[in-house]
Amino acid sequence: MALLEICCYSMECALTAQQNGADRVELCAAPKEGGLTPSLGVLKSVRQRVTIPVHPIIRPRGGDFCYSDGEFAAILEDVRTVRELGFPGLVTGVLDVDGNVDMPRMEKIMAAAGPLAVTFHRAFDMCANPLYTLNNLAELGIARVLTSGQKSDALQGLSKIMELIAHRDAPIIMAGAGVRAENLHHFLDAGVLEVHSSAGAWQASPMRYRNQGLSMSSDAHADEYSRYIVDGAAVAEMKGIIERHQAK
């Protein structure tokens, strides 16, 4: 049966995902940046309360995946922290200036991760040559690759995802970006074994007082009185679709 991973941005969302049938959680901060490394406090609280597998993302900033020496040092330290806390896996990825996997740095990450299952995240979708990259990731011992098939959403990239799945000795290919209940059957019919979804929605802040003339964001148009949460009903619906597909 296909595995359902839910992207979560808080301990509460991870619990919601677990309670509604998620098989695994990708734990992140900063949804508007596409996911950054969660704080130590969030990592500890999730580790204490969530019982399904949780894989934190290790990504020090938004933007590209080519990092300075200082940023890479922080990545390695975060990898060690996640390992010490007892998480079963993590999610990360580093590219070089030419859009290839930075093999020397990824080898250091894999050494620091030790027995943890490492997912190479959507840095894969920014690489120059996906099949060459897939061979490199297999050589590194990467457990899985999260990808939209190098398109803006995974449904548009489904043909590429199928090509990657068919590639000999490839890591597990997990489809993600825009995967929802209404299009999930396309991925299941294509033989995708793992799917990744935020299964979420923006929820209004409970604050009654709002200083509309002031923003804490560099984006003056950002809505700072909303937060992204996992929709438990959406998770349960996706899990039900997977179970019914398996029963066919």
Swiss-Prot record:
InterPro entries: CutC-like (IPR005627), CutC-like_dom_sf (IPR036822). One of its GO terms (molecular function) is copper ion binding. One of its GO terms (cellular component) is cytoplasm. Keywords: Cytoplasm. The keyword Cytoplasm applies. It comes from the Bacteria. It is found in: Cytoplasm. Its main location: cytoplasm. Signal peptide: none annotated. Transmembrane segments: none annotated. PANTHER family: COPPER HOMEOSTASIS PROTEIN CUTC, COPPER HOMEOSTASIS PROTEIN CUTC HOMOLOG. Homodimer. Belongs to the CutC family. HAMAP family: CutC (MF_00795). NCBIfam families: PRK11572.1. This is PF03932 family protein CutC.
